[in-house]
Amino acid sequence: YELRLDGRRKKAQAAGEELNRATLDANEQLRRAKLLEDLERNLEGFAQSVKAVMKEAGRGMLTGVCGPVTKLLSVPREYAVALETALGAAMQNVVVESEQDAKKAISLLKQRDLGRATFLPLTTIRGTVLDKREMEELPGFVGIASELCRCDPKYSGIRDSLLGRVAVAEDLDSAVSIAKRMKYRFRIVSLDGQVVNAGGSLT
């Protein structure tokens, strides 16, 4: 009788453990579904390829994906237009840990015919920052674009590579004046999003 009772106890215990596992699995699935739902909402306006990469990273199918550039930078409101203009399409570039991670993501996009995306591996991207000393005394100079936003230190190389050689001016007149003084060597963006390009063209 004791053996039979012990057997029943073990069966009940096993059934309880199985139920706990099933509950945990169900909770995990709900958690992942919620994460993907939030991700979808947060990626409104992004290209299909970028959304696909972020979804697969959320599912654990891609590793080393840090996120789109725009999600990794913190920009004060007063500089938002200027920095968005300076970044342009690069806002949707995807930062990854390594070249291997980039290759896997590119392969996935190609296999599923989901378009293209640009990947920025932390292991290879390095940036240089303009020397602002010559410009600091010029009327209308605001700063170097890379210094007007914040990010985790691990992304500073990415930030500097995209924004380190862009100056920000108060308005288009100031931008043109500074560009002339600096011999049109680099881009200058005004706070309202006008651009004096390297070489002298205006956008």
Feature locations, PLM:
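Extended, EK/Q-rich alpha-helical coiled-coil segments that serve as long dimerization/scaffolding arms
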Residues: 1-44
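Hinge-like oligomerization/junction regions that interrupt long coiled-coil arms in large cytoskeletal
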Residues: 28-203
